[in-house]
């Protein structure tokens, strides 16, 4: 039958709206009647009179019909109003009846509630969260059981309440989480750190309530609580002066075991399904490995060797899946047994501890959890599938210059369980292994000119082995055995460490990529069931495929002149699972056939070779992985993995390239260069001069014949004589100029160029200004190859010097570099046009006496605001207030020198177009 839901207030509102519509229509009809019922003829002829009479008759007919429609409208609105009033009266009566029904139900339930604490009709109460309280039982005659409350930390969840004759059982409560383990204590000087405490076990999930005796499903079991976090390992003690090695960091605590899933409730004896069991709780995360102690600087040793960081704790095992509830009884509707819950996810392995001042290795990742066991099927029902294995923990991160930790192994798949009348359950897949930990970068400690050895990037950690697939369940009478689970894939090897090739350090090799993990073995197929009378036994299940091996790690980019690391070898393919045993013959039936063996997994691909540095040598490609072995009964060997890709050849043309920029004393920018393949030396980056000028005492290599001589000087009083040579300038990372003019000082007064630059520690001046006419024969930037000679971006805040086109957008560009024309304002005074030199090497700068309105020979007073605008005075370029240590010197000249201030406030790009003029862009 159909049902009608009515809201009396809505009907009353609709009737009111209809009344308003009727009024508007009546007014419109009255207005139309005046103009349409008595039309005047358009002319005095008979035709015009006939047309006017015809249309007037139409209008009168419309008015007659409108009166009838209005009457119907009024009747309809009145009907809606009456209906709303009647529904309102009925609602009042129904409310009284409902109240009476609740009172009657209370009277019915009172005796049983008093005698046995359970209503005759009604649902049971739910357990309070966090208490593990059991759910209340449902009504004896009719009602569902209440849900169990969740458990307190480490405690089980409450059991679901049972139903009566008719009703569903309540769900079991979730188990409480495990308590975290205590952290290990730090070691004494030279000693090892203490191990972290293990995490607590998660509480078990509550059991599901039973379904009604006559009808109803069993309640689902509660989920097991997650295991507690393992405690962090203690920090290793620092090395003693007598012995340079620091202590080993403590091992991280083992993560707590996840709680077991709750048992599903039993279904009704006649009609109903068994409850689904709860999943096992998640395993706790392994504790963080303790940091290795720093090496102590011993007598005659530059740097002590730090001990290895503590190993990360294993992830906790996942909780076992709960057992599925039994299904309906004999003669009733046969419900399926509950599926076995998945094993809890294995906790991630703790990261390896940080190595000491030398190069400690990262700890290994923890192992993954084990998958849950499949639930038992009821008579006639199918068996539950085995749970999947937990995923292996990731390998620990390595420190600078050390190897990455190995990935944890994947958990094994759960075993399927056969059932009466059903096929064997499928074994769970093995968990995927964790990836190998990433290694650190190559560590360098001393500048290259001293010729000390520099560390190489660490080797990537090996990927963890894949978990084995679960065995297939045994088939019952006349049914096939379950299929074995697939083996988990091996984890990928960690990437090799980067080689370093930065300023003030020798280039070194990139680390090798880690080997891929071995694929997990496939599960064995289940045994076939005994043949039924007159029938044949079931075939055994097929063995699971071996997991594919993990890929070898790819080696990373190395510095110029160094070799890229070799790609890691691919992991071996997992062996195929064994064939299942054929079923036993039934009476008169033929025995089942053994299943075919699965193919072995393919070997993983070798890792890519590392890219050589610019103009460097390319890396070696990695070897392919070994194919997995097939089984004796029909399996095929896996294919050999492909070789890794050949490392890239160093690039010779670039659009942009960057080198480090070091700021000395917060005011002097310094970069490192090498002339004609010599040692790397520091030079002052100076936009206020043109050409490279070097102190001869730091240059020992032969530059060839002298191509010119001259005499020049710098503001500050230094005058020098020089020889000019044609040679190459190397900025590192393969940034090598074409042969260009370099000025080498032969004599100077007063003192040497090195003494003149002693504040910055530089041994030369790299003048990059296009239009200032200062000493030198050419700018080094114009000798850069390709587009790198377009200009240079100076970004002191980021610590970089970038060659090539400007990569920043939205800047303000003015003509001239470094000499240009600007408008200057002193405090709130008027704007004054003045020539200016944007001089990165000018320290605090100078200002003309006429511009500052101050006598020459002194400094601008602290607290003076100097603002510099474009020459039209419309756009501010930069502004600052002077201090006692940052104020320009007042000179009698006519050109303002900005000093370092604008470069400290923002990135500035110097363009070499147009030639000999250039532009300056404030970004």
Swiss-Prot record:
Zn(2+) binds at residues 686, 839. Residues 121-170, 330-351, 427-561 are annotated as: Disordered. A motif (D(T/S)G 1) lies at residues 686-688. Pfam families: PE, PE-PGRS_C, PGRS. It is found in: Cell surface. Keywords: Metal-binding, Zinc. One of its GO terms (molecular function) is aspartic-type endopeptidase activity. Residues 1-91 form the PE domain. Belongs to the mycobacterial PE family. PGRS subfamily. This is PE-PGRS family protein PE_PGRS16.
